[in-house]
C-alpha cells in the first residue's frame, strides 16, 4: 500500500470551529492539523508511477506527524466498503494508464491532548467521523484493512415460533396480525422463513410503502366511517379528472402541459434539434424524508431529494426532472448567538439531531444533491415551531419534516408503461449495493425512539448524485427514441431497496421472476443475502427490457459510463425466486461472474425450470401473493381529543414596536436567504421565476415558474401552502388554510383556471397519539370531501408519514440541550416546571401537518407578478382579505413569539379559516383578471406574520418605506396587522384605482378589499390609525430583525466574514443593487447575414460524466446558427468522434467525476494523462480556425489545460469560494476590453448573470501572471466599481476576475453562466425595457460571426 499526503483538509475558520466543538467535550484537546491522505493499492505484480500519482492527486509521500505531541487519527471510508470517491478516482487513474487496483482518500487529524477516558474518547470519535460510512483508525498502516476482502454474511433461517423476537431484533415493525399472517403462510409452505424473506415482507408491507393507515377502515367516536382516508383523497380526482393523465398509479402523477417543442440530441447522430411543437405533459411529485433527516441531516435530506428526482425520472417509461422544491419544519432553532424570548430551554432527544443541526446540515444536503444532479431548486418553505403542552409533552418537530418535490417533463407517448413479458430482462441500473439504508421503510414507520439506536443509523442512506446524473442520461437517451424506447416498465429503488423495487416491477406486470444475487453490483463483498437484497443504496433503478435489445441498452450505458446489470428474468409463473449463481455455472463457484452474460430464453415460463437444483435452500422462493396478497387490513378506532386548553393571547398589554420586530425575527417569517443561495436555480436554462426577486435579490417570490421549452413563453408554475400549527386548535381549518395558501401563492403566476391546478398532499401525523387519528381524519375529510370538490381542485399524488413523534427516557445528567452546534444550558436555566426527572419518559409530538404543493400550466410567463414594488410616486397598496371581516389570531406567529415560560402559552383562540370556498374562487379570478388587464404592479400573499410581514417584505425587496393606515381595519392594531387570514397585498397605480375598484366589485369582493398603505422613498415604516402614529420603525431596524436568522446561520455554517459582509450589503437602503448598462442592442442579430448563407459550422457540446449543463449550452449555439452536437468524452476516447471535425467546442458546467480531485481536475486529468487525447486537444487549440469556450466546470477544466492552449499560460486555477459555500447568485458583470472573439462589441456593458459554483475563486501562480492575464469579465457593484465585497463578488476572486481569454481571443473561460439566460425572461430580474433576447445571446452570435 502506498500512502500519499495532500493539502490541508480544513480551512482556518473550519479548523477553529471543529476545535471549539472538540473542546466542549474535552477542554484540553487541541486540533493541530488535518490533511487529506491517499491510500493506494496497485495491481498485483505491477508498480504505478509515483510521480504521476503525485501529480494527479497533488500529493507528496506522507511525512511524520507535524507536532510530536500530537496523536493522529485517520478518518477513512468504512472498512469493507468502496466509497463513491474511490470508484471515480480509481477510474480516472486507470484511464491515465496507472495499474491501480484502488485508491481511497481519508483525513489525518492531529490532536494534542487525546483523552484517556473511554467515554471521552468515544465522544470525540463520534464527532470526528460518521460511523455509517467511515472508520476511525489509529495509524496509516491500519488503513491496509481498506483493501481486505471480508467473507460474506450468511443466510439465516428463523423458526416460526421465533417471529416475534425476530420482529424486534431486525427492526421489522410488523403488527401482530402480520406476524400471524406470515406464520400461517410459511406453515402452509412447510418451512421456516429466511431472514431475507422476513425483511423483504416488512419493507414491502411497511406503513411507509403500503400506506396501511390511509387504506384502513375507520370508526370515529364510536361511529363507523364510510370512507378510508385514501378514498377521500381519490374523491377529488373523481370529481375533477380533467387535465390529469395519470393518478395514483405511478411514481409520480402526470398532468397536461402546454404545447411545446423538446430540444435534445438526435439519438442516432448526436445533433441537437428542436422537435415539432406537440401537446406536452409534466410529472409532479412531492416526497418527505423525515426519519433519515432526523438521524443524519445531510445525507437524510440529500437522499430525500435524490429519491424524489428518481421518482420523476421513473415515471411512465421515462421522465426528465426539471425543477425542485424543498421544505423543512423543525423545532426551535436555539441559535447560541441569537437567543429569543420564545425559545424556552428543554431536554432534547439525544438520538436525534437538534433543530439547529438539521437546519445547518439538512438544507446543504438537499441543495448539494440538486446542484450536482443538475436540477434547479426554485421553491421552498421553512417553519420553526414548538409549544409546551404539559409536563413531559411538547408539540414540536423534533422529528422534522423534510419535503422534497418538483416537476419533470415527460413526453405524452411515454406516460403509459408497458407490461413486462415472460423472458424480459430485469435490470438494475445505477450504483452498487452497500450496507446503508437497511430497513429504512420500516424504521420510518415507527415513532422515533421505538427502535434501537443502531437500527436508526442503519436506516439512513448515503448519496451519490453524480451517479444519478449518469442514470438520467441513459433514461434521456432511451426516451429520445420515442416509441422505440427499449424500457418497458421501471421503478426507482427507494425504501426496501431491491427487495421492494423488483417485486413491485414484476407484480405490476402480472409476472414472476428469477433473480441472481451474484449479478447484483456490490461494493461490499461482506453483504449477506438479506443485506444485499434489502439495503437502500441510492441512485438505482430497476427496469424491464426485452432481451433482444440488451446489447443496444448496454451500449447506451457504456457511453454514459453508467453501471447496469441484467440480474434476472421475468417468468409467466407468478413466483419470486432469488438465489446465487442462477444463470452461470461460474457464478455458482465464484459468487460473481459476468453480470450481463446471456439470460435464459424468452420462452421460459416457469421459475423452477430456470433454477438448477441448489446445493442449499434458496434465500427466497415464494409465490408473489405472499407479498402482495391478502395481508391483514388495518382498522383504526379513533376518538376526538378534548378541546385545546391554551389561553388566548391578550394584545392589550403588548408593545406594537416590539411586536413587529419579534414577528419579523421569527424563523418562519425571517429571511430564507441562507436556504436559497446554496441551491442552483438556473441550471437547465428554463427557469422563469426563482425565489430571488428585484435588483436587490431578496428571496420573496410567492411561486416558482419554468418554461415549457426554449422557444415558448408558456410553462408551468408551482407553489407551497402549509399552516400546520393551526392544527393544534382546528385540524380541519389548518388543512383548508394549507390549500388556500397554495392557491394565493400560485395567483402570482398566470394560471387560467382553478381546475387546471393539481395538488400534491403530504400528510404528517403522530398516529396513535391520543386524539391525533381523529384530527387527521377531520383534516382529510375537510380537504378531500369538501374544499377541493367545491373548487374543482384535485389531488392526484401525495405521501403520508404518520410516525411524527419522538420519545425517550431521561438519563442522569440530561438536563438540557446538548448536541452538535447547540451548547447545553445549565439545569438552572430551565424553569423548575420544565426540569426533566431522571427516568422520566419525554415525548415530542408534531401537529397534524398537511403540506400542499400546487402545480399548474401557465400562459405567458412575462405577466407574472412579484412582491417588488414599482417605483410609482402615485400608487397605493390594497389588501384583499378572505377572512370575511374576521381577524383571528389563534395559532399565529404573534402568539408564538409571546409564548412565555408558563406550562400553557397563550397560543389559543379561534384560528384563521377559509369559511367560504367560493370567496377563494372569486379572489383567484379577480387577481387573474386584474393581471391580464394590466392593473397590478406588485403582488404578495398574506401568510405567517400577517399583513405586517407581507408589507415589510415588499418594502425590503424594493428599498422603499411605507405609510400604513389602519383606519379601515378595525380598532385593534395587533389583530389588523398580525392576523394570518388568507389574502394578498397588491400595488395599484392611482390612475387605475377606479378600474380596480370596479373589478373588485364585479367579483363581489368589495367588503374584502381596502387601501392600506402607500410606498415612500423614506427609510421608515410608519403605522397610523385614528389620527395618530401608532408605531414607527427605521427601515434598517426592521430589516435587521428580518435578516437576523440568515446572518446567524451563515456565521455558524459559512465563513463568518462573508456573513458579515452580506449583511452590510443587504441592509444598505441606499445600495444601487443590480444596475445594468448596455453598449449594444441585444435584439440586433449580428449573425443573421452569415446564417442566411446556409452555412452552419459544427460545434461540439463537450461533456464528461457528471456534467449537467449541456442542453442550454447547445441551444445557444443552435440559436446563433451552429450545428451543435452532443459529444461525450467517451466518444473521443473510444474514437467514435474526432475533435478535428468541429470549428469550436464548449465545455459545459456541472460536476465532472463528482469533482473528486477538485473542480474540473478529474476532467482535465482524463485528457492530459491520455497521450492521444492530449495530442488531439493540443492540435485543436493550435489550429487558427477553431474556438473554445469553457463555462463553470468547463472553465475549471480548461484552466488545467493551459499548457496546451496557446496564449493561456497566465491563466489561474479555481479554488474553493471564500465563503466556503456553494454560491448561487445573480451578480453584475462588466465586460472588459479583451481579445475574446465571443465578447466583441460588448466591452463596457454591465450585465446581470447567473452564478452557481462552489470553487470559483481565481488564484494565480504569481502577481506577474495576474497582471499579464487577459481578463474578459469581472464582478462589479451597482456603481460600476470592481466588486471586492461579498456577495457582489460571490467567490472572492482578486479584482473580481471571473472570465479570461487567450492572447488571440479564441479560447475563453468564465465561471458564471451566460448560457443559462439566452432570453430576458430567464433572468431573475431585468429592466422593463429589455426585449426577448438576453444580452448574453450576443456571445454566441459573435462566435458565429467569427466563423464567417
From Swiss-Prot:
Documented EC number(s): 6.3.5.3
GO biological process, alphabetically ordered: 'de novo' IMP biosynthetic process; purine nucleotide biosynthetic process
Active site as annotated: 1192 (nucleophile), 1313, 1315
Domain (Glutamine amidotransferase type-1): residue spans on this chain: 1099-1348
Domain of life: Bacteria
Compartment(s): Cytoplasm
Annotated Gene3D superfamilies: 3.40.50.880, Phosphoribosylformylglycinamidine synthase, linker domain (1.10.8.750), PurM-like C-terminal domain (3.90.650.10), PurM-like, N-terminal domain (3.30.1330.10)
Keyword set includes Metal-binding: yes
A molecular function (GO) term: metal ion binding
Residues reported in the UniProt entry to bind ATP: 300-311, 701, 943
Catalytic activity: N(2)-formyl-N(1)-(5-phospho-beta-D-ribosyl)glycinamide + L-glutamine + ATP + H2O = 2-formamido-N(1)-(5-O-phospho-beta-D-ribosyl)acetamidine + L-glutamate + ADP + phosphate + H(+)
CDD domains: GATase1_FGAR_AT (cd01740), PurL_repeat1 (cd02203), PurL_repeat2 (cd02204)
Pathway: Purine metabolism; IMP biosynthesis via de novo pathway; 5-amino-1-(5-phospho-D-ribosyl)imidazole from N(2)-formyl-N(1)-(5-phospho-D-ribosyl)glycinamide: step 1/2
One cellular component (GO) term of this entry: cytoplasm
Residues forming coiled coils: none
Family of the protein in this entry: In the N-terminal section; belongs to the FGAMS family.
Function statement: Phosphoribosylformylglycinamidine synthase involved in the purines biosynthetic pathway. Catalyzes the ATP-dependent conversion of formylglycinamide ribonucleotide (FGAR) and glutamine to yield formylglycinamidine ribonucleotide (FGAM) and glutamate.
Subunit structure: Monomer.
Protein name in UniProt: Phosphoribosylformylglycinamidine synthase
Amino acid at each position: 500500500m502506498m500512502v500519499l499526503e495532500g493539502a490541508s483538509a480544513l480551512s482556518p475558520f473550519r479548523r477553529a470551529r471543529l476545535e471549539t466543538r472538540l473542546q466542549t467535550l474535552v477542554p484540553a484537546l487541541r486540533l493541530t492539523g488535518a490533511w487529506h491522505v491517499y491510500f493506494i493499492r496497485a495491481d498485483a505484480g505491477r508498480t504505478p508511477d509515483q510521480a504521476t500519482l503525485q501529480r494527479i492527486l497533488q500529493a507528496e509521500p506522507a511525512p511524520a506527524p507535524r507536532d510530536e505531541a500530537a496523536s493522529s487519527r485517520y478518518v477513512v471510508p468504512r472498512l469493507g466498503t468502496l466509497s463513491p470517491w474511490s470508484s471515480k478516482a480509481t477510474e480516472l487513474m486507470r484511464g491515465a494508464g496507472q495499474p491501480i487496483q484502488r485508491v481511497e482518500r481519508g483525513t489525518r487529524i492531529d490532536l494534542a491532548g487525546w483523552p484517556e477516558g473511554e467515554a471521552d474518547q468515544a465522544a470525540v470519535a463520534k464527532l470526528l467521523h460518521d460511523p455509517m460510512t467511515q472508520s476511525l483508525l489509529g495509524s496509516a498502516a491500519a488503513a491496509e484493512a481498506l483493501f481486505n476482502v471480508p467473507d460474506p454474511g450468511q443466510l439465516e433461517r428463523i423458526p416460526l415460533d421465533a417471529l416475534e423476537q425476530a420482529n424486534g431484533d431486525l427492526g421489522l415493525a410488523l403488527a401482530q396480525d402480520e406476524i400471524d399472517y406470515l406464520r400461517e403462510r410459511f406453515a402452509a409452505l412447510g418451512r421456516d422463513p429466511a431472514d431475507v424473506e422476513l425483511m423483504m415482507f416488512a419493507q414491502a408491507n411497511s406503513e411507509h410503502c403500503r400506506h396501511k393507515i390511509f387504506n384502513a377502515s375507520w370508526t370515529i367516536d364510536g361511529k363507523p366511517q364510510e370512507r378510508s382516508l385514501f378514498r377521500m383523497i381519490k374523491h377529488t380526482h373523481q370529481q375533477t379528472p380533467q387535465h390529469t393523465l395519470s393518478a395514483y398509479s405511478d411514481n409520480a402523477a402526470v398532468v397536461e402541459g402546454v404545447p411545446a417543442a423538446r430540444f435534445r440530441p438526435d439519438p442516432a447522430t448526436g445533433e441537437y434539434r428542436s422537435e415539432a411543437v406537440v401537446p406536452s405533459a409534466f410529472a409532479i411529485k412531492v416526497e418527505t424524508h423525515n426519519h433519515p433527516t432526523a438521524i443524519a441531516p445531510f445525507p437524510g435530506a440529500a437522499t430525500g431529494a435524490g429519491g424524489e428526482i428518481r421518482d420523476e425520472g421513473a415515471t411512465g417509461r421515462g421522465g426528465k426532472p426539471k425543477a425542485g422544491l424543498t421544505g423543512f419544519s423543525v423545532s426551535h432553532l436555539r441559535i447560541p448567538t441569537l437567543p429569543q424570548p420564545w425559545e424556552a430551554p428543554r431536554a432534547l432527544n439525544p438520538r436525534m439531531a437538534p433543530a439547529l443541526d438539521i437546519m445547518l446540515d439538512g438544507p446543504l444536503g438537499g441543495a448539494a444533491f440538486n446542484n450536482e444532479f443538475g436540477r434547479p431548486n426554485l421553491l421552498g418553505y421553512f417553519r420553526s415551531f414548538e409549544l409546551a403542552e404539559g409536563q413531559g409533552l411538547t408539540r414540536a418537530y423534533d422529528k422534522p419534516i423534510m419535503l422534497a418535490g418538483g416537476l419533470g417533463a415527460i413526453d405524452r407517448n411515454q406516460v403509459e408503461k408497458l407490461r413486462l413479458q415472460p423472458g424480459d430482462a430485469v435490470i438494475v441500473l445505477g450504483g452498487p449495493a452497500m450496507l446503508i439504508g437497511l430497513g429504512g421503510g420500516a424504521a420510518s414507520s415507527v415513532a422515533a425512539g421505538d427502535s434501537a439506536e443502531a437500527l436508526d443509523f442503519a436506516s439512513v442512506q448515503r448519496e451519490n448524485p453524480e451517479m444519478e446524473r449518469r442514470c438520467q442520461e441513459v433514461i434521456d437517451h432511451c426516451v429520445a427514441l420515442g416509441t422505440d424506447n427499449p424500457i418497458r416498465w421501471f421503478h426507482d429503488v427507494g425504501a426496501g431497496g431491491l427487495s421492494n423495487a423488483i417485486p413491485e416491477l414484476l407484480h405490476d406486470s402480472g409476472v414472476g421472476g428469477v433473480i441472481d444475487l451474484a449479478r447484483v453490483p456490490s461494493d461490499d463483498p461482506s453483504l449477506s443475502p438479506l443485506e444485499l437484497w434489502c439495503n437502500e443504496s441510492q441512485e438505482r433503478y430497476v427496469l424491464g427490457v426485452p432481451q433482444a435489445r440488451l446489447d443496444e441498452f448496454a451500449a447506451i450505458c457504456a457511453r454514459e459510463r453508467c453501471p447496469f446489470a441484467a440480474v434476472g428474468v421475468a417468468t409467466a409463473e407468478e413466483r419470486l425466486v432469488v438465489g446465487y449463481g442462477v444463470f452461470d455455472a461460474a457464478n455458482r463457484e465464484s459468487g460473481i461472474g459476468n453480470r450481463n452474460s446471456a439470460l435464459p430464453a424468452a420462452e421460459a415460463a416457469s421459475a423452477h425450470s430456470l433454477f438448477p437444483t441448489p446445493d442449499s435452500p434458496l434465500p427466497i422462493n415464494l409465490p408473489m401473493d405472499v407479498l402482495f396478497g391478502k395481508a391483514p387490513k388495518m382498522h383504526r378506532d379513533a376518538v376526538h381529543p378534548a378541546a385545546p386548553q391554551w389561553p388566548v393571547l391578550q394584545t392589550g398589554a403588548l408593545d406594537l414596536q416590539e411586536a413587529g420586530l419579534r414577528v419579523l425575527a421569527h424563523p418562519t417569517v425571517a429571511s430564507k436567504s441562507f436556504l436559497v443561495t446554496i441551491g442552483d436555480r438556473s441550471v437547465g436554462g428554463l427557469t422563469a421565476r426563482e425565489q430571488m426577486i428585484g435588483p436587490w435579490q431578496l428571496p420573496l417570490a410567492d411561486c416558482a415558474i419554468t418554461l415549457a421549452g426554449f422557444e415558448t413563453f408558456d410553462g408551468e408554475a408551482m407553489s407551497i401552502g402549509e399552516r400546520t400549527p393551526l392544527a393544534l386548535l382546528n385540524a380541519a381549518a389548518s388543512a383548508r388554510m394549507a390549500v388556500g395558501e397554495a392557491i394565493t401563492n400560485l395567483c402570482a403566476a398566470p394560471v387560467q383556471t382553478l381546475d387546471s391546478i393539481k395538488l400534491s398532499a403530504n400528510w404528517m401525523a403522530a398516529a396513535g397519539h391520543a386524539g391525533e387519528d381523529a384530527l387527521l381524519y377531520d383534516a382529510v375529510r375537510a380537504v378531500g370531501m369538501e374544499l377541493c370538490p367545491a373548487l374543482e381542485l384535485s389531488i392526484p399524488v401525495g405521501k403520508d408519514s404518520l410516525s411524527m413523534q419522538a420519545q425517550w427516557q431521561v438519563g442522569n445528567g440530561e438536563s438540557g440541550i446538548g448536541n452538535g452546534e447547540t451548547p447545553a444550558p445549565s439545569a438552572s436555566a430551565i424553569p423548575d416546571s420544565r426540569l426533566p426527572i431522571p427516568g422520566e419518559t419525554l415525548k415530542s409530538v408534531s401537529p397534524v401537518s398537511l403540506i400542499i404543493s400546487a402545480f399548474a400550466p401557465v400562459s405567458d410567463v412575462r405577466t407574472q407578478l412579484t412582491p417588488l414594488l414599482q417605483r410609482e410616486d402615485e400608487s397605493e397598496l390594497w389588501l384583499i382579505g378572505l377572512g370575511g371581516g374576521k381577524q383571528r389570531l389563534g395559532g399565529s406567529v404573534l402568539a408564538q413569539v409571546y409564548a412565555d415560560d408558563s406550562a400553557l402559552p397563550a397560543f389559543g383562540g379561534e384560528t384563521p379559516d377559509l369559511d367560504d370556498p367560493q370567496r377563494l374562487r372569486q379572489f383567484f379570478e379577480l387577481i387573474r383578471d386584474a393581471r391580464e388587464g394590466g392593473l397590478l404592479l406588485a403582488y404578495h400573499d398574506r401568510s405567517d406574520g400577517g399583513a405586517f410581514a407581507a408589507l415589510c417584505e415588499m418594502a425590503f425587496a424594493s428599498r422603499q418605506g411605507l405609510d400604513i393606515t389602519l383606519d379601515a381595519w378595525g380598532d385593534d392594531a395587533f389583530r389588523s396587522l398580525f392576523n394570518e387570514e388568507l389574502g394578498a397585498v397588491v400595488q395599484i397605480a392611482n390612475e387605475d384605482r377606479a378600474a380596480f375598484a370596479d373589478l373588485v366589485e364585479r367579483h363581489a369582493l368589495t367588503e374584502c378589499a381596502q387601501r392600506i398603505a402607500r410606498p415612500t422613498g423614506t427609510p421608515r415604516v410608519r403605522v397610523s390609525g385614528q389620527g395618530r402614529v401608532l408605531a414607527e420603525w427605521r427601515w434598517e431596524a426592521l430589516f435587521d430583525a428580518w435578516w437576523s436568522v440568515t446572518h446567524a446561520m451563515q456565521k455558524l455554517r459559512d465563513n463568518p466574514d462573508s456573513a458579515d459582509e452580506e449583511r452590510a450589503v443587504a441592509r444598505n437602503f441606499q445600495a444601487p443593487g443590480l444596475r445594468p448598462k448596455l453598449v449594444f442592442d441585444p435584439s440586433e442579430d449580428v449573425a443573421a447575414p452569415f446564417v442566411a448563407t446556409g452555412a452552419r459550422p459544427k460545434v461540439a457540446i463537450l461533456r464528461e460524466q457528471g456534467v449537467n449543463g449541456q442542453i442550454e449550452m447547445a441551444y445557444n449555439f443552435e440559436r446563433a446558427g451552429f450545428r451543435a452536437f452532443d459529444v461525450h468524452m467517451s466518444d473521443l476516447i473510444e474514437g467514435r468522434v474526432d475533435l478535428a471535425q468541429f470549428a469550436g467546442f464548449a465545455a459545459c458546467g456541472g460536476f465532472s467525476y463528482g469533482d473528486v480531485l477538485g473542480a474540473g481536475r478529474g476532467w482535465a486529468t482524463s485528457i492530459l494523462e491520455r497521450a492521444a487525447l492530449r495530442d488531439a486537444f493540443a492540435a485543436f487549440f493550435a489550429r487558427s480556425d477553431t474556438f473554445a469556450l469553457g463555462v463553470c466546470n468547463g472553465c475549471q477544466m480548461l484552466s488545467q489545460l493551459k499548457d496546451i492552449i496557446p496564449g493561456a499560460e497566465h491563466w489561474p486555477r479555481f479554488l474553493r469560494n471564500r465563503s466556503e459555500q456553494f454560491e448561487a447568485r445573480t451578480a453584475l458583470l462588466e465586460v472588459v476590453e479583451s481579445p475574446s472573439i465571443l465578447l466583441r462589441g460588448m466591452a463596457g456593458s454591465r450585465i446581470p448573470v447567473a452564478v452557481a459554483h462552489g470553487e470559483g475563486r481565481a488564484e494565480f501562480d504569481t502577481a506577474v501572471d495576474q497582471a499579464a492575464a487577459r481578463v474578459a469579465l469581472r464582478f462589479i457593484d451597482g456603481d460600476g466599481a470592481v466588486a471586492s465585497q461579498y456577495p457582489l463578488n460571490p467567490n472572492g476572486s482578486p479584482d473580481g476576475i471571473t472570465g479570461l481569454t487567450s492572447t488571440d481571443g479564441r479560447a475563453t473561460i468564465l465561471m458564471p453562466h451566460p448560457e443559462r439566460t439566452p432570453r430576458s425572461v430567464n433572468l431573475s430580474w431585468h429592466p422593463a425595457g429589455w426585449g426577448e433576447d438576453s444580452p448574453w445571446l450576443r456571445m454566441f452570435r459573435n462566435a458565429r460571426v467569427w466563423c464567417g
